[in-house]
Structures are given as C-alpha cells and as structure tokens.
C-alpha cells in the first residue's frame, strides 16, 4: 500500500472529493480483504504450522493467536487511512498522537504484562491504539479530508467486523472436525480458510 501513495496523491490532485472518497472506499475494502484473510489464517492456521515446524510444545494458547490477529488486522485496516492522511496534507492533525500512543502502550504493557504475561503485552498494543489513532485518524480524514460524517467510516468498519466474525465462526465450526497430522491439518485449514474468507468477503 505504501507503493500506492504517489498514485493516490495524483488522484487526489486531479479528482473531486466524491471520486477521492470512492477510491478510498475501494482501498479500504482491499485492506479488509487482505488483512481479514490474514487474521483468520493467524487464528486458525498458525498453531498447526508451529506444531509442524517446531513441535506441539511450542504451540501457544489460542488467546495469543487471537490477540496477534487483532493487532495485525487493526494495523492493516489503517493503511488506506494513513495513505490518505499523508496525501491530503493532513499532517498537523494528531502530530503528537504517536507519542501518546507510545506512552499508553508502555503503561498498559507494564500493567497487563504483570497480570497476563505475553497476552497482556500484546493486548496493551490494541488498547493503546484503540484510544488514539484507531479512531482519531479516520475521524480526521473523513471530517477534514472528505467533508463527510465520521459515522460513514465507522458503520463500514463495524460491518466489516461482523463479516469477519461470521467467517471466523464458520471456520471455527468446520475446523473442529479436521483431524490427522499437523501437515494434513495445516494444508486443509489453509485451503478452507482461503475459500471461506474469499467467499464471505
């Protein structure tokens, strides 16, 4: 997505706000497709791949893949937002936000890490991001970039989450019936996860 920055900047310079927003929605949908698919893979396939490569003793509790997938997804879904924030010249909004995110991340990591271990440290990143740029940067580009209500973005974001959870529910239901070796499980789950994600999204 970083490679698209120049093209998006040129598009913004030559097109109307409506056309700009249409392109933003398209890129946001591509974000959801790619990172939603990847998040499902992390949740449902990573354990079998770890077992295959390193042994079952290195497979972590399902909470770890879940929170890793959540981190992966939330960062990925910000790609289009950050691209448009840069190309629309909205730098001055939230210029100190990254500092706040870092401070919150450290504070939450210490607090949650002591109580929940590595799960708490990974969870801290989501909390820190959720309190800062996860909502603020979309607000900036919707309000100051496209002159639209931020609710437009939020509704689509929540709808994408619903679709992702439905796909995850289907995967979780089907995968409980898959047996065999770690190699067989990995191959079958990767194929099914890809089919379900691409079919649902």
Can you describe what each PLM-predicted range is?
Residues 7, 15-22, 140-158:
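Interhelical loop/hinge segments that connect adjacent transmembrane helices in multipass membrane
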Residues 28, 58-61, 81-90, 147-154:
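Short juxtamembrane and helix-loop transition motifs at transmembrane-helix boundaries
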Residues 21-75, 106-114, 164-169, 173:
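Alpha-helical transmembrane segments of multi-pass membrane transport and lipid-handling proteins
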Residues 101-104, 115, 154-201:
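Transmembrane alpha-helical segments of multi-pass transport proteins
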Residues 1-28, 82-87:
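Helix-loop junctions and terminal segments of transmembrane helices
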Residues 1-2, 44, 63-113, 118-144, ...:
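Short runs within selected transmembrane alpha-helices of multi-pass transporters and secretion channels
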């Amino acid at each position: 997505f970083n490679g698209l920055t120049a093209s998006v900047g040129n598009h913004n310079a030559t097109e109307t706000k409506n056309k700009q927003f249409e392109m933003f929605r398209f890129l946001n949908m591509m974000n959801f497709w790619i990172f939603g698919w990847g998040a499902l893979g992390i949740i449902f396939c990573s354990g079998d791949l770890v077992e295959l490569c390193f042994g079952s003793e290195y497979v972590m509790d399902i909470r770890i893949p879940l929170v890793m997938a959540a981190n992966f997804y939330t960062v990925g879904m910000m790609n289009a937002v950050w691209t448009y924030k840069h190309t629309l010249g909205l730098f001055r909004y939230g210029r100190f936000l990254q500092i706040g995110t870092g401070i919150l991340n450290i504070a939450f990591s210490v607090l949650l890490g002591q109580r929940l271990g590595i799960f708490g440290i990974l969870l801290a990143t989501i909390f820190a991001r959720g309190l800062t740029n996860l909502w603020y940067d979309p607000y900036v580009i919707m309000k100051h970039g496209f002159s639209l209500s931020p609710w437009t973005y939020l509704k689509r974001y929540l709808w994408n989450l619903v679709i992702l959870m439905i796909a995850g529910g289907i995967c979780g239901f089907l995968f409980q019936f898959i047996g065999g070796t770690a190699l067989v499980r990995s191959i079958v789950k990767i194929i099914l996860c890809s089919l379900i994600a691409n079919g649902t999204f």
